[in-house]
Amino acid sequence: MENLLSVENAILITGPTASGKSALAVELAKRYGGAVVNADSMQVYDTLRVLTARPSEEEMQGVPHHLYGHVPAGAAYSTGAWLRDVSALLPALKAAGQLPVFVGGTGLYFKALTGGLSDMPEIPEGLREELRMRLVAEGPEGLHAELEAIDPAMSASLNRQDGQRIVRALEVIKATGRSIAEFHRRLGPVLIDADEARKIVVLPDRAVLHARINGRFEKMLQQGAESEVRALLALGLPAVAPVMKAIGVSQITAMLKGEMTREEVLEKGAAATRQYAKRQMTWFRNQMDESWERLAP
């Protein structure tokens, strides 16, 4: 990391889960007098600190950390909401003389941060909840048929099984009377100039990454992941709530119901994490251009 000599307005660090990027963010924040800003869509929630690998106080090493655990578990939180939070945070960091060090595995956050994002409308919570419940009851194909009737062009561009995007498209057209495609064509402001930021994508060797993932999931169970899932289930959130999709929730839930042993939870949880990391690695390789420094720790 000795070649990190020129840092202008920000440091951006991404990479797959368990790649060591959070520790790198702390190291660089300490070196440059910075503050760490979360760019992971699961670590924003106020539950599942252990299961989402949110940094502990010890791991933060006294470095300021922002946008971690600030969203209630059942709340909707989009890329647009994250950008608004970042926009509100940046002036305070600048006033404090702290360099923002963004770190996380949500690639879309980084794309929006440096390229802008469509200014999407606010959706009434009642409408959002209604469509989520219908997705559970009817499945994605039923909602896709409804979208096809009122927004055929948009429906044609979506996979019939992609329930999340189908629901999002229905939310927008029902709330505004306009296709989500119209909003996609209008980009909001760019918050970070990519040409003046140090950009790093951490891509460990696959064997190294898999070993880290296997050890991490076992450690999570030892540190209280089971209790976190119990507390989450007690909230009675719908299965389609984003936080319910965190890796490990379904496996630990099955164990709590007596449907899976601890050994099976370890095996299946680690396997799901490895699959997720593989998808992340593919996305980063395809989406992060040559201006992103590849780091193989």
UniProtKB/Swiss-Prot annotation:
EC number: 2.5.1.75
An example Gene Ontology molecular-function term: tRNA dimethylallyltransferase activity
Keyword Nucleotide-binding carried by entry: yes
Catalysed reactions, as listed in the record: adenosine(37) in tRNA + dimethylallyl diphosphate = N(6)-dimethylallyladenosine(37) in tRNA + diphosphate
UniProt-annotated site: Interaction with substrate tRNA, residues: 106, 128
Binding site for substrate: 17-22
Region feature Interaction with substrate tRNA, mapped onto this chain: 40-43, 164-168
InterPro entries, per database record: Dimethylallyltransferase, IPT, P-loop_NTPase
Enzymatic class: transferase
Annotated binding of ATP, by residue: 15-22
Protein name (record): tRNA dimethylallyltransferase
Species annotation: Rhizobium etli (strain CIAT 652)
Primary gene name: miaA
